[in-house]
Every structure is written in structure tokens, then in C-alpha cells.
Amino acid sequence: MSNPGGRRNGPVKLRLTVLCAKNLVKKDFFRLPDPFAKVVVDGSGQCHSTDTVKNTLDPKWNQHYDLYIGKSDSVTISVWNHKKIHKKQGAGFLGCVRLLSNAINRLKDTGYQRLDLCKLGPNDNDTVRGQIVVSLQSRDRIGTGGQVVDCSRLFDNDLPDGWEERRTASGRIQYLNHITRTTQWERPTRPASEYSSPGRPLSCFVDENTPITGTNGATCGHSSDPRLAERRVRSQRHRNYMSRTHLHTPPDLPEGYEQRTTQQGQVYFLHTQTGVSTWHDPRVPRDLSNINCEELGPLPPGWEIRNTATGRVYFVDHNNRTTQFTDPRLSANLHLVLNRQNQLKDQQQQQVVPLCPDDTECLTVPRYKRDLVQKLKILRQELSQQQPQAGHCRIEVSREEIFEESYRQVMKMRPKDLWKRLMIKFRGEEGLDYGGVAREWLYLLSHEMLNPYYGLFQYSRDDIYTLQINPDSAVNPEHLSYFHFVGRIMGMAVFHGHYIDGGFTLPFYKQLLGKSITLDDMELVDPDLHNSLVWILENDITGVLDHTFCVEHNAYGEIIQHELKPNGKSIPVTEENKKEYVRLYVNWRFLRGIEAQFLALQKGFNEVIPQHLLKTFDEKELELIICGLGKIDVSDWKVNTRLKHCTPDSNVVKWFWKAVEFFDEERRARLLQFVTGSSRVPLQGFKALQGAAGPRLFTIHQIDACTNNLPKAHTCFNRIDIPPYESYEKLYEKLLTAIEETCGFAVE
């Protein structure tokens, strides 16, 4: 007769389900791992392996195994990179968890559990990160079908409310805050009071002292309308793009200097090697301190000039609540100030140099040393000489088919026809084009043709609204003709003094100028790749990397290999040839499958704007010439606004500016586009807004009309007509409705 007690103490049959892993460590600079999980029952020799998942840090397996577990047995679940396991003993290890015998009984039948991955041993040098999700079920409780589980939901409850985890194209994890509309690389954590046992992941070694927590009752950390989430992401991209649209950013501090802030918010600079501190910004030469401030233009938004009790001027940054003695405009515009000083020195030298018998040998002020506004003025003069005195470039399109109809008409024309005065008409609308309709056309068209939806372009990064050519654009058989069209439109915008609403990466503009690309250009486009390549150059890679002169590219899910040089797959990267490898890699990264597309775009652009006219500009200046200023300076807007039938003290005017200051950057841009036809500001600021017959300031016109009417815009005259609304709330509501809902032109 069998003994029930003896049977109960024998091996127990359990079903282990290995569902997925998350946030695995990325050990290769340029490739993602091929993870698989290995299950070993220590003591009995049972061993199982999951399938291999290609190129991911978040593999999903959902595979189960029936295990016989003895009383003293433990289970080790390890994760490995299939690409590396054949290299040497222990290669490819990505982390493991070990379930001790007494913890197995407590894990059993508790649903899916999240376990932190850890090292094989405490002295192991391998970097480990991430979690694995598993479940243990008694064999007699296993049903005919398993529960379908969304792996992503198992991890969401670790994040604070309103946060979302995303992954960039290079595999790096970033965190999106939907409340503040910001992104960051560091994983956000909940306050201590928010942590509770159901949300805490398990330790990698699980024993009787480790609390067992389930995920069945976990709630998703962020749930929202997908359309709202997409709108928030686009708004974030828009803000990030516009915040970077400046001519030149302040240069880095000299080596050995650090910028610090006192407890009172005063900014100072410390030389770490000598311990000497100073209030003066070391990036700015001291002889520039007495420069005329009017030459530098207005202060940045949120800054104010004040005087100390002794009369010394200092600057208050209300954005960061700090003060400093150095004018913030000096560091941002240092290149212009130095250029201007060099120009004056050259002029002084010319005055003391005797006249040369040959005029060609006389000293002149180099054109490239003039500031951007002067160079742009010269460009406009040279372009105006090319414009025919008679005839028009007439284009009639519908708003619904603006992309295709514009493409067909523009591509039919000869390049010299595109130089004629631009006359745009929207079908079914009676607007006369004195500039405003053309600005509206370019605004709408640029939104369409640059939209990644059409496959011609793609976002360069997940967190900023800059574009690059899509290497897989060939899915459209006519893609080269469309790139030719895009180049023509960009050239037409520059030629006729308008702007494209959108922007590319700075290396794109550099290539458009015919300049070579360097490693430094990679930093803004792909920071992770830039850091990896810099690390290769600055460190001895002997025995560390096993790369060859062959790189991989993911094209719609298919992994394609590209050799950087002939037979590159068999040429290892060594300490001796690593500089060549980095140079070839950078060139391939920026021209990866886009050579033909870029040449077609460049051809269209140069058909309208000859390349020799752009030799004096750098890539940042070219970006501003094509796209204008994205950052809207409300102070400059106010100063350069004309009032008609109202005064600065009129309620309509005060309420209008109150609404503008309340708007975020995106709504300010929409308001500007509603009134002027373009969301971009000229390089010289609002004083350079163009109307039907030359410069025309932004105009607020109070009209005698029913207060139930919406404000009305006259884009050809940069004028907005506003009825005498009874309250700020009504003006705000009507103004918002007008800029969000209305479109179309009419003739009065």
C-alpha cells in the first residue's frame, strides 16, 4: 500500500511560463542582442531554452515548460545573447534569477511575477540590467488555455502617474512626462509613500525573506486617448524644435571652467584647477563689456536688466531665477560681435594702407565677415536681378489635394518660370495674392510634403521635430521626382522671401551647402552613436570590440548588412584602423541609402537658388534662411505692432496681448500664421514682416462690428480685425476659435 506522505515529499510537477523580459542591457554599440532564456533545475539536470528573438532589448517568448521540482531543488533562469554565446565561455550573458526551493512554493499559483535580473556572482564584471516575467503553476491547476497577457502592462505600474516609457530608434530608453510634456533619460521614481508591495519587482535571488508580489491586480501607469497622446508628442516635438531654432548657441566653457550658482541664485564661474572664481563669463572677452547694448538687440524672453546699489548693471533670468553680470546676449551673439570688430579693424587697416596700383590687390572687407542680416540683404539683391520683370508664376490648387496638385504644376514649369512673381490661388476662394496667399500655400504644403506619413522623410529623433531623408523612400516608385519637387519648393520659398514650416537636421543643411560631414555633426542627430564613436577614438579597443567594417541597417523589419569598404565583412576594426572606421561609419550614417534622394532634392533647390550665392553662409544660417525664426519673441512682437482705431490702453489691445502671453509656443505660431499666412518670423524680427508692397508691421485693428463675430485676418496686410468684445474671456474664446477652426480666403 502506498504511503501518501511519501508521495507528497517527492518531486512536484510544475509548469514554468517564461513570458518576456524588459530593458535588457545593450552591450554592443551598434547592434541589439538576440535574447533567449535558459531554464535549469539545479540538482536534477533538467534544462530548457526558449526560442531566440532577434534584435531587441524587450524579448517576448511566452513559452512554458513542465518541470519536476524536488524538495531541495532550485531553478535558475538566465538570459543570453545568441550572437555572443559562441565567442567564448560565458560570453553573451545578459542576467539571471535564481528561485530557491522555499520561494518556489510561495511563487506557485500567484500569477505572473516580475523578477530583477542580476549577475552570476558578486564578483562578476558583467553589466546587468532589466527584468524577466515568469509564472509557476501547479500541474493539476493548468487549464486548456493560457491567459493572454500584455507584457507592456506588467511594467507600467513602476512609473509615476502620467509617465510613459519609450525607446528610441537606437534602442535607448527615454521617459515621457505627459503632464509637463517633457522627456528625460533617467527613469522616474515614485515618492516613497506611493510604493506598495503590488508594484515592487522581486529580487533576483528569491527566498523566504523576499515578499512575493503579483501583477494580476496591477494597473497601467498611463492610459489615455491615443489621439491625445499623439497630439502631445507632436506638441513636444514642435516645442523642442522651436527652442533650438536660434542662429548660434552659446559656445562651451573653456577647459577647466565650471558654471555654478550661489544659494542666492547668482551665477559665477569656477576655475577648478586653481580654485579661482569670477563673476565674468570666460567665454566673453573682457574688452566687449563696454559694447553698445543696442547692437545686440532685445534681451532673450524672461530676462531683465537691473542695477546694483552702486550702479553696476546686472541681468535677471526670471526663467531660472538667477542673476549674472555678463550680458546673456554676448555669449549667444559672440560670433556677430567679433565679426563686427574684425570688420572695423579691417576698415581701419585699409585707411592706413596706401592705394595699390592694381585694384584687385587692394584690401577689402571679406563678404563672409558681415553678419547674417547684411549677407541676406546681398542675397536678396542678387536674386532680385534674376527675377523677370514681366509675367507671373501662377499656381491654382485645392486645399484638399494641395500636395499632388502643387507637385504636378510645379514640375511642369521650367526653372526660370519659378523666378517669376508668385501668384497662388486656392480653388473656390476669391483671395488676391499680395503675398499672404503664397505664405499660406507654403505653410500648408510644407506640412504635407514633409509629413513622415508619405514616406519621403522621417524624424531624426523621437524627441525633436527635425527631419531627415527616409532611406526607405523607394517604396514610392516616383520618390526621386518628389524629392526634386521638394527641393524646388524650398528654393522658391527662399527666392520669394517666404519660409518653410518645418526643419531638417543641421548636417542636412551642411550637405546642401556642399560641405563635408564630421563626427561632431552626429551629436545632435544621434547622441548615443556619437558617444559610442567618440569612445572608440579615445580608448584602446584592443580585445574589447569585435566589430568589422560591416554595419547593419533595419529596413522595414529586414536586417540589411552594408560593407563600409570592399570586403569589409572580413576586415576587423583595430586600434590602427579605427579612425578610418569612424570616418566611413559617419559618412554612411548620413548618406545611408539616400544619395540619389539627396541629389534630386539638391538639384531642385539649386535650379532656383544657384549654389554659388550661398557660399558665405554656414549651415545654421541656411536653416534660418529657409525656415525663419521658430521662436516667437513676444516683446519684439509688441514693439513692432501698429494699432489702428485703438490705443495701447484700449481693452482690446491689452486683452489681445494677455491672450498671446497665455498661449504656448504652438498657439502663438498658429496665431501668427492666421494673421500673416506664416508661422515663421523673419530673421530681422517682426519689424521685417512683409506685406503687399514691401515691409508692413503686424497690425491690430479694432472694428465696429457685432461682438458675436470672430476676429478676421488680412494676411496680405498682416492685419487682424477685432470687434470690441465686452470681456477678456470672450476675446480669448473668439480668438482661439478663429485660429483653430477657420480657413479660406475671400475678397471684400
Curated annotation (Swiss-Prot):
Residues 1-119 form the C2 domain. It is found in: Nucleus; Cytoplasm; Cell membrane; Membrane raft. The active site is at 716 (glycyl thioester intermediate). One of its GO terms (biological process) is positive regulation of trophoblast cell migration. The keyword Repeat applies. It catalyses: S-ubiquitinyl-[E2 ubiquitin-conjugating enzyme]-L-cysteine + [acceptor protein]-L-lysine = [E2 ubiquitin-conjugating enzyme]-L-cysteine + N(6)-ubiquitinyl-[acceptor protein]-L-lysine. It is an enzyme of class 2 (transferase). GO terms for molecular function: identical protein binding; SMAD binding; ubiquitin protein ligase activity. Gene3D superfamilies: 2.20.70.10, C2 domain, Hect, E3 ligase catalytic domain, Hect, E3 ligase catalytic domains. Keywords: Cell membrane, Cytoplasm, Isopeptide bond, Membrane, Nucleus, Repeat, Transferase, Ubl conjugation, Ubl conjugation pathway. GO terms for cellular component: cytosol; membrane raft; nuclear speck; plasma membrane; ubiquitin ligase complex. Induction: Up-regulated about ten-fold by activation of the TNF-signaling pathway in vitro. Residues 157-190, 251-284, 297-330 form the WW domain. Auto-ubiquitinated and ubiquitinated in the presence of RNF11 and UBE2D1. Ubiquitinated by the SCF(FBXL15) complex and TTC3, leading to its degradation by the proteasome. 'Lys-48'-linked polyubiquitination mediated by TRAF4 at Lys-119 leads to SMURF2 proteasomal degradation. Activated by NDFIP1- and NDFIP2-binding. Residues 414-748 form the HECT domain. The keyword Metal-binding does not apply. There is a cross-link at residue 119 (Glycyl lysine isopeptide (Lys-Gly) (interchain with G-Cter in ubiquitin)). Pathway: Protein modification; protein ubiquitination. Its main location: nucleus. The second and third WW domains are responsible for interaction with the PY-motif of R-SMAD (SMAD1, SMAD2 and SMAD3). Interacts (via WW domains) with SMAD1. Interacts (via WW domains) with SMAD2 (via PY-motif). Interacts (via WW domains) with SMAD3 (via PY-motif). Interacts with SMAD6. Interacts with SMAD7 (via PY-motif) and TGFBR1; SMAD7 recruits SMURF2 to the TGF-beta receptor and regulates its degradation. Does not interact with SMAD4; SMAD4 lacks a PY-motif. Interacts with AIMP1. Interacts with NDFIP1 and NDFIP2; this interaction activates the E3 ubiquitin-protein ligase. Interacts with TTC3. Level decreases under the suppression of SCYE1, suggesting that AIMP1 stabilizes SMURF2. E3 ubiquitin-protein ligase which accepts ubiquitin from an E2 ubiquitin-conjugating enzyme in the form of a thioester and then directly transfers the ubiquitin to targeted substrates. Interacts with SMAD7 to trigger SMAD7-mediated transforming growth factor beta/TGF-beta receptor ubiquitin-dependent degradation, thereby down-regulating TGF-beta signaling. In addition, interaction with SMAD7 activates autocatalytic degradation, which is prevented by interaction with AIMP1. This is E3 ubiquitin-protein ligase SMURF2. It comes from Mus musculus (Mouse). The lineage of its organism: Eukaryota, Metazoa, Chordata, Craniata, Vertebrata.
